[in-house]
Amino acid sequence: MIKFTHLVHHHHDEHHHGEEHTHNTAELTICLTMQERTKSRLKVMLSDGSEAGLFLPRGTVLKEHDIVESDDGVQAMITAAEETVSTVYSDDLLLLAKACYHLGNRHVPLQVEAGWCRYLHDHVLDDMVQRLGLNVKVEQAKYQPEPGAYGGSSAGSHDGHHH
C-alpha cells in the first residue's frame, strides 16, 4: 500500500501565469470530502482503484489540486468530492453578507464566493437563511470552506484575541 507522507504542492487560488502549471505531474488522484481533507491519517482509494494511506503532519488541511507524495516519489493530486451542500445565491450582497455573518456567528465552516456562499447541508441553517429573505439551493457540489474554519495549522489563529 502506498503511504503518502508529505504535501509537495499546496494549491492557492491565484491564477498562475505562463507555464507554471505544467509541473503537475501526478497521474493518480484521490477524491475526498471536506471532512476527509482535514484528517492527517486516513485510508484512501486512488483513482486506479488501489488503496493507499495518508500519513501527513498533524493539522494538515488539504485543498483541491494539492499534490501529496510518498517517500518513494509517487504523487497524487487531491480532488474535492461532491457533497450535499446548501448554496445561497444572491445579487443582494448586503443580505448575503448578513447571512454569512449569522452563519459565521454559529461557527459554520463557510465557503464564501462572489455572489454566493455554501455550507454543508443543514435544514436548521437553511431555515435561518430563508428567514433572512434568501433562497437556499440544496445541491451536490464541491465544498471548500474559508481557511481557518477547521483551525488550520497556524498556532494562535485568533491573532491574540480572546473570546
UniProtKB/Swiss-Prot annotation:
A molecular function GO annotation: unfolded protein binding
Biological role: Involved in urease metallocenter assembly. Binds nickel. Probably functions as a nickel donor during metallocenter assembly.
Origin species: Aliivibrio fischeri (strain MJ11)
Gene3D superfamilies: Urease metallochaperone UreE, N-terminal domain, UreE, C-terminal domain
Superkingdom, taxonomy of origin: Bacteria
Protein name: Urease accessory protein UreE
A Gene Ontology BP annotation from the UniProt entry: protein-containing complex assembly
Keyword list, A-Z: Chaperone, Cytoplasm, Nickel
InterPro entries (UniProt xref): UreE, UreE_C_dom, UreE_N, UreE_N_sf
